[in-house]
């Protein structure tokens, strides 16, 4: 056996490790069927100007991305996306939501909607903070 260290991760190597981990996890998880959830707002030209990407898995909705373009910020667009995602998650049987956000992103936004900070990473990546939130639906 040989130990290799790299700063350039090849897709094939990443896929091999991911597939090994996935096989291990699927043998142990009770719910093996995560379902993607994408909600997009498009302009008249079909360009995405705001959107939500997450996944529902068992009791949980995991929020991966929630983004609103500059021109739509502070007009209720983010709230609309979040409410819709939570509604769909409930319909899918979810009881909780989990997300992470940086200090310069939207912690106050999520707190306004009942999300509670579970923990935070200080000095991430250098001087900022990364927060992890949970909400009971």
Name what the model sees in each region:
Residues 56-64, 73, 125-129:
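A conserved beta-turn-beta hairpin within the catalytic core of GNAT-like acetyltransferases
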Residues 89-102:
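Conserved GNAT acetyl-CoA-binding A-motif
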Residues 72, 76-84:
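Conserved acetyl-CoA pyrophosphate-binding loop and the N-cap/start of the following alpha-helix
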Residues 17, 110-111, 115:
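Conserved active-site tyrosine of GNAT-family acetyltransferases
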Residues 98-100, 116-132:
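Conserved catalytic-core motifs of GNAT/GCN5-like acyltransferases
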Residues 32-35, 43-45, 52-61, 66:
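A conserved beta-strand-loop-helix scaffold within acyl/acetyltransferase catalytic domains
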Residues 1-9:
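Conserved N-terminal entry element of GNAT/NAT acetyltransferase domains
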């Amino acid at each position: 056996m040989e130990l290799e260290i790299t700063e350039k991760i090849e897709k094939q190597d990443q896929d091999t490790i991911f597939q090994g981990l996935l096989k291990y996890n699927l043998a142990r998880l009770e719910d093996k069927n995560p379902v993607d959830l994408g909600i997009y707002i498009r302009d008249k030209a079909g360009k995405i100007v705001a959107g939500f990407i997450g996944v529902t898995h068992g009791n949980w909705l995991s929020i991966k991305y929630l983004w609103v373009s500059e021109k739509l910020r502070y007009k209720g667009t983010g709230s609309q996306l979040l409410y819709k995602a939570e509604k769909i998650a409930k319909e899918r049987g979810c009881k909780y939501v989990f997300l992470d956000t940086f200090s310069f992103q939207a912690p106050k936004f999520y707190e306004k909607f009942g999300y509670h900070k579970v923990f935070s990473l200080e000095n991430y990546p250098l001087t900022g903070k990364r927060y992890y939130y949970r909400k009971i639906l």
